[in-house]
Curated annotation (Swiss-Prot):
DNA polymerase III contains a core (composed of alpha, epsilon and theta chains) that associates with a tau subunit. This core dimerizes to form the PolIII' complex. PolIII' associates with the gamma complex (composed of gamma, delta, delta', psi and chi chains) and with the beta chain to form the complete DNA polymerase III complex. This is DNA polymerase III subunit alpha. Its main location: cytoplasm. Belongs to the DNA polymerase type-C family. DnaE subfamily. It catalyses: DNA(n) + a 2'-deoxyribonucleoside 5'-triphosphate = DNA(n+1) + diphosphate. It comes from Xylella fastidiosa (strain Temecula1 / ATCC 700964).
Length: 1193
């Protein structure tokens, strides 16, 4: 620590979440001013020459590890502390600042903060600790009491005597660790408290310290700080009623400024330095603390993992064939090498812990993925049942997972069934102790679009202005305002219109300038998707805990206050329990298949033992691009790729999963051409053939780069992994060193420097985007399993797929289309046949799930099914309502089921069932009341399932088809009894030439491609004309509208922007049939296709305006034919479309054909109702409208 006489001991950072704009560097090196992306606490402290700092965020230690590491990097002493809100029934909540004297103090503070989050939730929000808790955990902590304390509150109320007694009480607790905080930031009440504090300090010998209660870095940040406070509190900056709690003086002042500010109280300055010298926390970073895994008494962790691994390998090899070219001895040698490495690095316990909870999960029937990440390259992991993919057949490398030349913690990422993942986490908590197991925190930040909207709101700007600016920010993941303004490293994401508006409009300048000051600040805390830590001791001995609260105000589901990187820094071992919905789909499908197999006495399907060379799966699913709903291969782009590549072996799937990413995607045409012999496969060196043969001479995987370094450059695989990492970082000095090593190794194999450099350059190029083969192989196995199920058991697979996304109507509709493409029958929901989920009732039939009806909850569905299974089918609406309790079955749910067609069996028709509903509900409510009061005379004591009352219920004619279809659309998200577009289909298709089904749209885009493995020539958009019924309209401000078109064969989302909206916006309304012209493109983000509208026409108006002639063939020999036809035509006159009638008449010489043209006053208006009436007349045998559409004029 330098000789400066002042140290800031009270600083809030962004991690206080509501009242600070001070950034904490994410990486230690960003503490240097020249390396900081934006000014942060440490970079500013370096500029000011501050010797030490204390971070004291409100009720948390979120920032501690990041702050600690960054401070040490630049030689600033880090002091750990926190502001605590303290609450007791007799007084309003008040504040106290605690600083850690040492590591023991840190543990006490950690305990105290954790207790606050677990037990101290306040009804009005936030948490507070009780004063007694502070007394229980005060040791090795220093306390700062200022004007926000209870003493400050009492003083403000004129009770100096009670205020002094308060300080005396805390002096008794903290002794010489108590300090009184003096501030001079221009806020109300400061000077009276300062004078009081100085007086008490003199009397009681309590030291005073100077503080600036820091909230922002520089004085000019005050507006941004106030904006942040307003965002958090939901207020506006110019709201005269909002509290003005802060002042523009609360910035990180220099020591000189503080010295001038407190020149009259030099002790207050000196005492900060003295206190800082007494704070000597030393965080124990970089050492791992594994939980204690129990082994038998006569075993050690190392002997036990060896024993378990060898036994596991033997069991595996009894069921699985050896890899081609490998012997049993090869397997044992590889196993021993891995075990030696694991034991030497001290990770036996880690492997055993992971194996234990995975094996437990499998014993419980919980679906678990075959592997994820580089862990799939470990033979020990396969032997211990951690993974389900033998690494040897696919040349997967253990060193990619655990490098003996680079000590780092192994990291198994485990995929679990989404439905049952929490069961495994609960098992781990029970086994190791709930106080030692926790999930991990994650922090949300103020992202570009969101912060613009937030700032616009607190500035009081019109919504239209703010919305229009936010929409100009590209939707690229992780984009910053700097990128959008063209100030990033590249201009790829620059928005020209945003830049233009920023330069031209003062309001936009103000909005974006303020938003950029707040962008990327931490704004909230949540739970990491899958991270779980297991500690050898209670977690609070390593870090504090954070928790949301339940309805009783107690903390629930605690998480660590350190994020996934920081928990590892303090030695906690992280395990990733990830949820993968595909595993749930596979599990549901296999259970349904085996249920059917059991009824038919057929052996069950074992999804883990599938042959990976099933020809129908490759031919009918992968090579044909029939991969909708197939894991990783669903997108339209991937389906096109599959049709080109025509994979016919598992290795191809691994490669395609790895290649279908930005960067390596450019290699796909070459890969495809080489696979099919259109191009020659060339290897950089003959020795690399075995490494590259599965990918036809192309480097696709990181493992291939490592093996090239080993075979050509003489590296060990451990060293090769270090080379791969170095190539990814592209540090010139490090690369030059490795190039020389590679040359020397290659020379030993007889290769000259020129050729060695050529291969090194090739490796360096591919290392930049090479994929992890272990991960690709494990996930390709899951893909293959879904494809195999789709090919051999399509009904069960599609039923499971539909069930997995029942709450997502758009996905349900898409999957139903795919089911029909597979020639599966989908039966409407039916209370006498449907379960909660979709079910395969036969090999070619799926029964709609009741749970997919909007407005019908799971508990209702389960009650319906349970009652039906116990007491038989429902026979009437009354029977149904009396058997399913009203508490679960309300009127809204009943109406939804009627509209969905689920109650069709219970009455004459839907209209009748709906008509009967009020009387049935009234009767069942009466029955319920009388049963509750014990009056059984009316209803008797009938057994469940038997009618208990008879009503004379009315019936009526069925609703019109349009009403039925609308009801289905509202409750199911789709039309079941037909489609409103059906009457128009023939005429519209003659106009536009195609439907909206996926294959038709693929053909349109596919016409832009050259085949035979040549490089694609895809255009960003393909101009086309489509038509459909508008089923939804979604507006984004005044400049963008999204409409979804359907035609009963498919659907597409169309977008219209300001240029099109000005001319055609009035046409974009629901239930209108539109013909649209625009740019068709593949929607890689959401899957499927989208179209940007440039022109559109109302179909009905187009018929009227552009029909050139109506052609009719009429048989006048039928009775009164002409009278009927003429009467129909008369109702559509006057009009602009002439007619040509091909007439068939009787004459004395037999049938005679003739033609009659009608025009002028005999012309008609072309409307769909006219065409419908004419088509229904028995005398009309042919009808056609000739158009001259506007797009061909």
């Amino acid at each position: 620590m330098s000789t400066s006489s002042f140290v800031h001991l009270h600083i809030h950072t962004e991690f206080s979440l509501a009242d600070s704009t001070i950034r904490v560097p994410e990486k230690p090196e960003q503490a240097h001013p020249k390396k900081a992306k934006q000014a942060n606490l440490l970079s500013r402290a370096v500029e000011l020459g501050l010797p030490a700092l204390a971070v004291t965020d409100l009720n948390n230690l979120f920032a501690l590890i990041k702050f600690y590491k960054a401070a040490e990097t630049v030689g600033i002493k880090p002091i750990s502390g926190a502001d605590l809100l303290i609450a007791e029934p007799e007084h309003p909540p008040w504040g106290m600042t605690l600083l850690c004297r040492d590591h023991a103090g840190y543990l006490n503070l950690s305990q105290l903060i954790s207790r606050g989050w677990l037990e101290g939730h306040r009804p009005e929000g936030g948490v507070a600790v009780h004063p007694d808790w502070v007394r229980d955990h005060h040791k090795n902590l220093f306390a700062l009491i200022g004007r926000h304390s209870l003493a400050g509150q009492l003083l403000a109320k004129g009770r100096a005597d009670l205020a002094e007694q308060q300080l005396a009480d805390w002096q008794h607790v903290f002794g010489d660790g108590l300090h009184l905080e003096l501030t001079r930031t221009g806020r109300d009440g400061e000077e009276p408290f300062n004078q009081f504090a100085l007086q008490v300090a003199g009397i009681r010998g309590i030291p005073v310290i100077a503080s600036n209660d820091v909230r922002f870095l520089v004085q000019s940040d005050f507006l941004a700080h106030e904006a942040r406070v307003c965002i958090a509190s939901g207020r506006m900056l110019d709201d005269p009623k909002r509290p003005r709690t802060y002042s523009e003086q609360q910035y990180l002042r220099s020591s000189e400024e503080m010295a001038a500010l407190f020149a009259d109280i030099p002790d207050a300055l000196d005492n900060t330095r003295t206190l800082a010298q007494r704070c000597n926390i030393e965080m124990r970073l970089g050492t791992y603390f594994l939980p204690n895994y129990p082994v038998p008494n006569d075993e050690t962790l190392d002997s036990w993992i060896r024993k378990q691994s060898h036994e596991g390998l033997e069991a595996r090899l009894l069921k699985h064939p050896l890899a081609p070219g490998q012997t049993r001895e090869d397997y044992v040698t590889r196993l021993e090498f891995e075990l030696d490495t694991i034991i030497k690095m001290g990770f036996s316990g880690y492997f055993l812990i992971v194996a234990d909870f995975i094996q437990w999960g499998k014993q419980q029937g919980i679906p678990i993925g075959p592997g994820r990440g580089s862990g799939a390259g470990s033979l020990v992991a396969w032997a211990l049942l951690i993974t389900d993919l033998d690494p040897l057949p696919y040349n997967l490398l253990f060193e990619r997972f655990l490098n003996p030349e680079r000590v780092s913690m192994p990291d198994f990422d485990i995929d679990f069934c989404m439905e049952r993942r929490d069961e495994v986490i609960s098992y781990v908590a029970r086994k190791y102790g709930r106080e030692r197991v926790s999930q991990i925190i994650t922090y949300g930040t103020m992202a570009a679009k969101a912060v613009v909207r937030d700032v616009g709101r607190v500035l009081g700007f019109p919504y239209g202005l703010v919305d229009s600016v936010a929409k100009l920010i590209p939707s690229t993941l992780g984009i910053t305002l700097k990128d959008a303004m063209g100030e990033g490293e590249t201009n790829d994401n620059a928005s020209a219109e945003l830049i233009q508006r920023y330069q031209a409009e003062e309001d936009v300048q103000e909005l974006l300038n303020l938003a950029r000051q707040l962008e990327d600040l931490t704004r909230n805390a949540g739970k990491h998707a899958g991270g779980v830590v297991i500690a050898p001791n209670p977690l609070t001995e390593f870090c504090p805990l954070f928790a949301e609260h339940d309805e009783n105000g107690r903390g629930k589901n605690p998480v660590t206050q350190f994020d996934k990187n920081d928990v590892e820094e303090v030695g906690l071992v992280k395990f990733d329990f990830l949820g993968l919905r595909t595993l749930t789909i596979i599990d549901w499908a296999v259970k349904a298949i085996n249920k059917r197999h059991a009824r038919a006495c057929i052996d069950p399907v074992d999804i883990t033992a599938l042959p990976l060379d099933d020809i129908p799966t490759y031919k009918d699913v992968f090579a044909s691009g029939n991969t909708s709903a197939v894991f990783q291969f669903e997108s339209s782009g991937m389906r096109r790729l599959l049709k080109d590549a025509r994979p016919d072996r598992f290795e191809d799937l691994i490669a395609l999963v790895s290649l279908y990413r930005p960067g390596p995607m450019d290699l796909i045409p070459e890969f495809t051409a080489r696979k099919h012999g259109v191009q020659e496969t060339i290897y950089p060196d003959p020795r690399t053939k075995n490494i590259l043969k599965d990918t036809y001479g192309i480097m696709v995987y990181q493992e291939q780069v490592m093996q090239m370094a080993q075979i050509v450059g003489g590296y060990s695989l451990g060293s090769a992994d270090l080379l791969r990492r170095a190539m990814g970082k592209k540090v010139p000095a490090e690369m030059a060193k490795h190039r020389e090593i590679f040359r020397e190794g290659a020379a030993k194999g007889g290769m000259d420097a020129v050729k060695a450099d050529e291969i090194f350059d090739l490796m360096e190029k591919f290392a930049g985007y090479g994929f992890n083969k272990s991960h690709a192989a494990a996930y390709a196995l899951v893909s293959y399993q879904t494809a195999w199920l789709k090919r051999h058991y399509p009904a069960e697979f599609m039923a499971a797929t539909l069930s997995s996304d029942m709450d997502n109507t758009d996905k349900v509709v898409g999957f139903l289309d795919e089911a029909r493409n597979l020639n599966l029958k989908v039966l409407r929901p039916n209370i006498n046949h449907s379960a909660y989920m979709f079910e395969a009732t036969h090999a070619d039939t799926i029964q709609y799930g009741l749970g997919a009806i909007k407005g019908v909850g799971q508990s209702v569905c389960e009650a319906i099914v349970k009652e039906r299974l116990h007491y038989g089918p429902y026979t009437s609406l009354l029977d149904f309502c009396t058997r399913v309790t009203s508490a679960k079955l309300n009127r809204r749910a009943l109406e939804a089921m009627i509209h969905a067609g689920a109650l069709d069996e219970l009455g004459k028709n839907r209209a009748s069932v709906m008509l009967q509903l009020p009387e049935v509900i009234k009767a069942t409510e009466q029955m319920s009341r009388e049963r509750e009061s014990g009056q059984n005379s009316l209803f008797g004591n009938a057994d469940p399932g038997t009618p208990v009352i008879q009503l004379d219920l009315p019936e009526c004619e069925e609703w019109p088809l349009t009403r039925m279809l609308n009801g289905e659309r509202e409750t199911l998200g789709l039309y079941f009894s037909g489609h409103p577009f059906d009457p128009y289909r023939k005429q519209v298709k003659e106009l536009v030439g195609c439907d909206l089904n996926t294959s038709a749209l693929e053909r349109i885009l596919g016409s832009q491609q050259r085949g035979n493995g040549e490089k694609r020539t895809w255009q960003p958009e393909v101009n086309t004309i489509l038509a459909g019924l508008v089923v939804s309209v979604r507006r984004k401000g005044d400049s963008q509208v999204f409409v979804q078109l359907e035609d009963g064969r498919g659907r597409i989302e169309c977008s219209a922007f300001s240029d099109a909206l000005a001319e055609f916006g009035h046409l974009l309304t629901r239930d209108r049939i539109l013909i649209v012209k625009g740019g068709l493109r593949e929607d890689e983000f959401n899957g499927g296709y989208s179209l940007r509208i440039r022109q559109c026409w109302d179909y009905a108006q187009l018929c009227t305006d552009y029909a050139q002639r109506l052609l009719l063939r009429v048989d006048l020999r039928t009775s009164h034919a002409w009278e009927r036809i003429d009467a129909i035509l008369a109702r559509y006159r006057p009009g602009n479309t002439p007619l040509r009638l091909d007439l068939l008449l009787n004459s004395t010489h037999g049938p005679v054909a003739g033609t009659l043209d009608l025009s002028g006053g005999q012309s008609v208006r072309i409307e769909q109702s006219l065409l419908d009436k004419l088509q229904k007349d028995p005398a009309v045998s042919k009808l056609k409208v000739k158009y001259t559409p506007p797009w061909v004029q």
